[in-house]
Curated annotation (Swiss-Prot):
Organism placement in taxonomy: Bacteria, Bacillati, Actinomycetota, Actinomycetes, Micrococcales
Organism from which the protein derives: Renibacterium salmoninarum (strain ATCC 33209 / DSM 20767 / JCM 11484 / NBRC 15589 / NCIMB 2235)
Protein name from the UniProt record: Protoheme IX farnesyltransferase
Gene: ctaB
Keywords on record: Cell membrane, Heme biosynthesis, Membrane, Transferase, Transmembrane, Transmembrane helix
Catalytic activity, EC: 2.5.1.141
Subcellular location: Cell membrane
Family: Belongs to the UbiA prenyltransferase family. Protoheme IX farnesyltransferase subfamily.
Function, in words: Converts heme B (protoheme IX) to heme O by substitution of the vinyl group on carbon 2 of heme B porphyrin ring with a hydroxyethyl farnesyl side group.
Amino acid sequence: MRLTQAPATTAAAGNPPHKLGFAAKTKAYIALTKPRVMELLLVTTLPTMIFAARGLPNIWLILATMIGGAFAAGSAGAFNCYIDRDIDKIMHRTEDRPLVTGAVTPREALVFSWALGILSIAILWFGANPLAGLLGIAAIFFYVVVYTLILKRRTAQNIVWGGVAGCMPVLIAWAAVTNKVEWPAIILFMVIFLWTPPHYWPLSMRYSEDYKAANVPMLGAVAGARIVSVQVVLYTWAMVVCSLLLIPLGHACIVYTVVAGAAGLWFLLEAHRLHSKASHDTVTNKSAMKVFHGSISYLTLLFVALAVDPFVGMPLMG
């Protein structure tokens, strides 16, 4: 895979005004990996492993999967920063990224991305199993090639299909424990797939002017609030229904069942509130961001319940 390097024109576009110290340089490399995105992905990994094992897996397997998964996500994030550095300098939300400020050069970022990606696959392959390694390759490929290079600047549905990369950690986690991909893993994959639009589209509403300036067709930048809110509601309904399929098909117990139902109902209400405000032309950045942050809370609650579930009670069905 060859990534074309866009020319840097100023110090802010990739030529640091002075040499950074070790601590500052390390901080810049960490920022390249998009640690907030990485944290969110890792929230799903350990609970999925616990649920797959119906208990606590081997500690070394947990470490290999978590570290390998984190490095894979970090590699994908760094590749994304490298490719998108031309539009990152236009958008206020991304103007402090290391390649924009010049804290890291494009060459350094590209070498770092490849090194981290190769290391991540090696850790997953040998620390877990080859299937986990192959799924790690698929995750990086989908985020870098399918989302960043192909979809992001071409379609308002970019994060729908590009979001597949964000679903891969649950498949990697399940495969690490069982050496196969089974129906419960596919259900969890679909939950995150359906969760992605209600998570990102409210954010695109908040930063619609940024995306317009960068000519990135995020739905919140190219469609009105009413259209976006309808899509958020529809995807949220599908997500909640999908999450409940884990009860009959994944042998979920009482903790997961209660939390999936209650958290799902709460997030549905938030999605419908957004739609109601959009319908009355009273939607604000604050109300859009409330749904964005609510989506993170929902996913966190769901996967915490998934981790606790095997230790409490018996499966309700199956």
